[in-house]
Each structure stands twice: as structure tokens, then as C-alpha cells.
């Protein structure tokens, strides 16, 4: 018999249940079919960034071009974020979710416009079927504008998160330069069109699930970002849609996973494409992932780079739009496999 979800705010409240609540159960046509998922193998490229600013830069830029155009996802090693910074971030994030609920729910909100909030599922006010995920989401650039609203417990949370966010932002800026070059653009092109830039983080907590075949941590979706940089623990759960099938991405220690978001797809005029991915859960182990989402500022105007558009053989696929228009559309819906970008296609003549 399905467990009642009334009066419970977080999915972690149900982790010890025998069955998942009925409002987490996906229709039969929309279940993860875990037995049909392929193991990762060489599912996404692994790129070594050690010489990104050395004599092999052109080689690495070409590797990025290939990964972005063929996969939309890649892993990176020798990325410049110190291991100690990464380890502290994972430790304090897990400590946050292991606190008593009375401490965690101080930050609870179902309002997606809040710049720091604990919540559950994806957009709990719009999701018709809930997802087996709790999350803390926060804005982190400029850090001084937001740090005082971040959780103060665990006591080291703000200091550790600020150190991590600063280090990952530096990595993102290096990647954006290289990706700009991979498109044949000036290295500062993408950074310049993002306005003041915006950086968000999410701390995704996926508790053990008694019936993982019936639900998702997050269903298939594409990111609204320019790029996303994902730190995950050693519990498998990320899956990428490649060649008409779902492929599991096995965690590799000391790496990040990077994926192209919708805004990069627009800027590149479809040369690089945002890719469907999802998170699944399991019966035995909790899973923690920490994505950094990099966005334009809300007043930035996004559109295909002029250098990638011509009237002969490369017409603009998307119209230009203020990023706030996309942002509002993205959050006024549940998470869906259909991309928001369909609403931003350029008119055809």
C-alpha cells in the first residue's frame, strides 16, 4: 500500500519506507527501465586539461570541439580545482543533509525565485509526479551578495562553499575561453555576451530508494545553462542519452563532468547541442552530486554568434532574446524532455 506523503516536506523522510509514496510512482510508459541501460565504457570523452595553457592548447581545444559537437558531455581531469577543496565540499555537503530535519528545513521553500533554498523534487509546485531528490540550491556569484543567506550550519559550510565556488568559477572561465576558440571565435566572445554572469550551485541528495525502478532522481532533461560542471561522488546514477539509448556514466575519481546547456546551443547556432540526461536512484546507497550552473545575467541578450551565421549555408536557427524570457519559461513548467528552445527558434521565411 502506498505511503502517504501528506505533511512531509522532503523525500529523505521516506528513505526507510518499504514502498515509495504513490505521488512518486511514474506511469509505466515513463519509468527508467534500468535493465536496458548500457554501462558507460567510453560513453563520454575524458579530456586532460593539464596543458590547456601550454604548447598543446590547440590539441585540447580540438578535443573540446569534438566532445561538444559529438557528445555534448565530457569529463575533465587535471582541471585545477584542488583535491582538498573538492573533498571539503563533498564532506560539508553530506554533513548538511545528515543534520536533523529541524535544522535543514529552516531553508525550505517551494519558490524557485529564492536565491537560497532547500526543496525537493524539481519544481515541487509544478511537478505532477515527484522525483526522489532533495536539494539545496544557492546563488554564488558575486559571493558577497549571497553568502550571508547561505546555511550557517554546518559551521564550515559558508567558508568551504565560497572556496569551492571561487575555484570552479575560475575553471568555468578557462573552459569558456577554450570553447569559444573551438568555435572559431575570439577567446573572450562567450564570456563577453553573458553580461555580469550568474553562477548557481545545487547540492543534490538522493537517498536510498525502496523501489528505484518506479521513479527517478531526476527525469530526462536538458540544462538551461551555458555550461554545467558536475561534481559527483562514487555512487553511479548519472545517465546520458546517446545514440537512442540511455548510457550510465561511471564516476571517475578526481574528475568533473561538463555538459553543454541550452544557451551554448543557441550561441553556437546548433554546432554544439544540449543533451538529455537523467539521474536514477538505487536501494542501497545515498548519492550526492554538486552541479555548478553557469548562466548569463538575466538582462543579457542571447542569440547565435554573428560569426557563425551567414545567408548562404548557415542561417540563424534561433532568434535573439533576453535571457530572462528563457528563464521565466523554464521555471514555469515541470522538468520535461522537450527543450525550451523550441520557443526560441528563428521564424522561417
Curated annotation (Swiss-Prot):
Top-level class of the enzyme under EC nomenclature: oxidoreductase
GO molecular function, one term: dioxygenase activity
Domain of life: Eukaryota
Cofactor(s) for this UniProt protein: L-ascorbate; Fe(2+)
E.C. numbers: 1.14.11.-, 1.14.13.-
Disruption outcome: Impaired production of 2,3-DHBA sugar conjugates but accumulation of salicylic acid (SA) and its sugar conjugates. Precocious senescence. Enhanced expression of senescence-associated and defense-related genes.
Pfam families hit by this protein: 2OG-FeII_Oxy, DIOX_N
Cross-referenced PANTHER family: OXOGLUTARATE/IRON-DEPENDENT DIOXYGENASE
Functional summary from the UniProt entry: Converts salicylic acid (SA) to both 2,3-dihydroxybenzoic acid (2,3-DHBA) and 2,5-DHBA in vitro but only 2,3-DHBA in vivo. Component of a negative feedback regulation system of SA levels during senescence. Regulates both onset and progression of leaf senescence. Negative regulator of defense against Hyaloperonospora arabidopsidis. (Microbial infection) Confers susceptibility to the downy mildew pathogen Hyaloperonospora arabidopsidis.
Name this protein carries in UniProt: Protein DMR6-LIKE OXYGENASE 1
